[in-house]
């Protein structure tokens, strides 16, 4: 398809409108330079009076011009300045007073403005609150002492003194006497700000004299923390995690040891020496007691992991003791009574399934242990040693249990 060209159309003239403009047209400002003839017809302003002597240092531009509404005369008035103590009056009043015959003193009294004299030094400053200022406050007026020790630490602390050499360089001073200068000298050489007591002794190490009005007595006593369950029954549920000592032997407190030592020595302080061993062992006879002790130690090793009392009733085994499948020993009555409520083992918590075997070997070992303990107590009494009350009570209970059987 070919494009068709249209002939150009003539521009149409705007249609005349009869509507009036709504906004008025702003007038144009015209500036005209005044000629020499116009300047001659102007009225000259009267000369302003000279400033006072005290106000000579003020700026000459501190004047305000005002125009009198009644006469149309333009009068210059001096601007009020709070830093001057001069008496100020307008030139209009001055001219009126001279014309009316008023004296100068009356004019000053009527138009005097009293102001404070700012030339004198102020004793109090409202911005610094000097009325409540303390002696240890930081003062910013003195630039030399802004960062001094007295301003930073206050007046209540004493100034630290530094020693100087002849040349003026700082000498090696003690930690408490060195003034901080921002240099790190290590942890041991830090400055100390703790004030020392002048009455305190200068000695830092070594013995210090005790006060004469106080008497101190120190007594060290033997009181070990022994596991009560292990001592009474030979078994502890905590095992190796128990924080108490697992020991079944008898121990004595400090006062008991002292009493036993006094009974043995009978009050004698210097005891004669005794021979503890002999180098000649060829003619030494065989000691049957050592062999017996070795045999007893072997038996005790067997009974080390076996409690010598029932852990349920915490008493000696009554009737015939029984052993569970896990290897723990109980009284027959205690084991059956517990099995009615809880079928698990009282020592380890494993299931027993109602199986309790007779512990015949345990009965024989316990009898040997009782006989050996009785023999040791008898020998101790013969040597004059004291026997603990717990051993006697255990012996009596064991005899009572055997009698009941």
Curated annotation (Swiss-Prot):
Basic and acidic residues: bias regions: 370-386
Biased composition (Low complexity): 15-29
Protein keywords: DNA-binding, Metal-binding, mRNA processing, mRNA splicing, Nucleus, Spliceosome, Zinc, Zinc-finger
Subcellular location: Nucleus
InterPro entries: CWC24-like, Znf_CCCH, Znf_CCCH_sf, Znf_RING, Znf_RING/FYVE/PHD, Znf_RING_CS
Disulphide bridges: none
Domain of life: Eukaryota
Comp. bias intervals (Acidic residues): 56-70, 387-405
Single GO term (MF): zinc ion binding
Task performed by this protein: Involved in pre-mRNA splicing.
Similarity-based family: Belongs to the CWC24 family.
Name the record gives this protein: Pre-mRNA-splicing factor cwc-24
Source species of the chain: Neurospora crassa (strain ATCC 24698 / 74-OR23-1A / CBS 708.71 / DSM 1257 / FGSC 987)
């Amino acid at each position: 398809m070919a494009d068709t060209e249209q002939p150009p159309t003539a521009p149409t003239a705007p249609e005349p409108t009869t509507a009036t403009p709504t906004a008025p047209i702003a007038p144009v400002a015209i500036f005209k330079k005044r000629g020499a003839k116009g300047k001659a017809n102007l009225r000259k302003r009267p000369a302003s009076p000279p400033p006072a002597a005290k106000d000579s240092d003020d700026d000459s531009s501190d004047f305000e011009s005002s125009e009198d509404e009644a006469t149309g005369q333009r009068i210059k008035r001096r601007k009020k300045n709070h830093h001057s103590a001069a008496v100020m009056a307008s030139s209009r009043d001055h001219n009126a007073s001279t014309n009316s015959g008023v004296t100068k003193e009356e004019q000053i009294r009527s138009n005097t403005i009293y102001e404070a004299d700012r030339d004198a030094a102020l004793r109090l400053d409202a911005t610094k609150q000097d009325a409540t200022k303390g002696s240890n406050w930081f003062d910013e007026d003195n630039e030399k002492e802004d960062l001094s020790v007295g301003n930073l630490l206050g007046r209540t602390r004493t100034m630290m003194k530094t020693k100087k050499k002849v040349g003026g360089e700082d000498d090696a001073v003690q930690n408490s006497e060195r003034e901080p200068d921002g240099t790190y000298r290590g942890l041991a050489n830090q400055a100390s700000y703790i004030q020392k007591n002048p009455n305190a002794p200068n000695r830092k190490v070594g013995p210090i004299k005790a006060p004469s009005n106080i008497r101190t007595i120190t007594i060290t006593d033997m009181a070990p923390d022994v596991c009560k369950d292990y001592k009474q029954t030979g078994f502890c549920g905590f095992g190796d995690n128990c924080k108490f000592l697992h020991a079944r032997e008898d121990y004595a407190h400090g006062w008991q040891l002292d009493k036993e030592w006094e009974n043995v020595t009978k009050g004698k302080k210097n005891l004669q020496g005794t021979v503890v061993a002999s180098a000649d062992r060829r003619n030494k006879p065989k000691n049957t007691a050592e062999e017996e002790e070795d045999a007893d130690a072997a038996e005790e090793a067997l009974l080390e992991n076996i409690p010598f009392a029932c852990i349920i009733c915490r008493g000696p085994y009554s009737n015939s003791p029984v052993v569970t499948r896990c290897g723990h020993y109980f009284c027959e009555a205690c084991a059956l009574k517990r099995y009615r409520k809880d079928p698990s083992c009282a020592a380890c918590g494993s299931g027993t399934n109602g199986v309790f075997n007779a512990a015949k070997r345990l009965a024989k070992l316990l009898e040997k242990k009782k006989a050996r303990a009785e023999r040791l107590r008898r020998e101790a009494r013969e040597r004059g040693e004291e026997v603990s009350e717990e051993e006697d009570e255990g012996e009596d209970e064991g005899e009572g249990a055997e009698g009941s059987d």
